[in-house]
């Protein structure tokens, strides 16, 4: 018996909506990353994008446990000497919670062209309103 290998044109994609209000950032991000990769499907193939679309709402109401809100830093480098930029998560969540969510999920996806393609299926919104109602997204209850 041969192993099944999914073809990109055969993949059936669904839309899911996840409410992040009051849930830990890492737990939501890890489950969303699995859905974006397609690991929740029996047709999962590592080198093919078999994942579904995910809409995250209420990104500004996400929770960071412990002292992470004050102590954890969001870092990036300008590629100039001494160009390390650090912003506390408290400020980053206040200014742009969408970016914080996208970064958390991006770091859990594969690096390279396939991971970038998977990340394009993630839509993050600050409040409870989103403009993807036409796709009839299913409400996804997170496991943990």
Curated annotation (Swiss-Prot):
Belongs to the universal ribosomal protein uL13 family. The gene is rplM. Part of the 50S ribosomal subunit. NCBIfam families: rplM_bact. It comes from the Bacteria. It comes from Clostridium tetani (strain Massachusetts / E88). SUPFAM superfamilies: Ribosomal protein L13. Keywords: Ribonucleoprotein, Ribosomal protein. PROSITE patterns: RIBOSOMAL_L13. PANTHER family: LARGE RIBOSOMAL SUBUNIT PROTEIN UL13M, RIBOSOMAL PROTEIN L13. InterPro entries: Ribosomal_uL13 (IPR005822), Ribosomal_uL13_bac-type (IPR005823), Ribosomal_uL13_CS (IPR023563), Ribosomal_uL13_sf (IPR036899). GO terms for biological process: negative regulation of translation; translation. Transmembrane segments: none annotated. CDD domains: Ribosomal_L13. This is Large ribosomal subunit protein uL13. One of its GO terms (cellular component) is cytosolic large ribosomal subunit. This protein is one of the early assembly proteins of the 50S ribosomal subunit, although it is not seen to bind rRNA by itself. It is important during the early stages of 50S assembly. One of its GO terms (molecular function) is structural constituent of ribosome.
């Amino acid at each position: 018996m041969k192993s099944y290998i999914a073809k990109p044109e055969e993949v059936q994609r669904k839309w899911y909506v996840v409410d992040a209000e009051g849930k830990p950032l890492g737990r939501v991000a890890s489950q969303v990353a699995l859905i974006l990769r397609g690991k929740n499907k029996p047709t999962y193939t590592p080198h093919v994008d078999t994942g579904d679309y995910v809409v995250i709402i209420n990104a500004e109401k996400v929770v960071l446990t412990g002292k992470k809100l004050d102590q954890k830093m969001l870092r990036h480098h300008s590629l100039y000497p001494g160009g390390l930029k650090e912003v506390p998560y408290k400020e980053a969540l206040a200014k742009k919670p969408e970016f914080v969510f996208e970064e958390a999920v991006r770091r859990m996806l594969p690096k390279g062209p396939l991971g970038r393609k998977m990340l394009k299926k993630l839509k993050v919104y600050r409040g409870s309103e989103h403009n993807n109602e036409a796709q009839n997204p299913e409400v996804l209850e997170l496991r943990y």
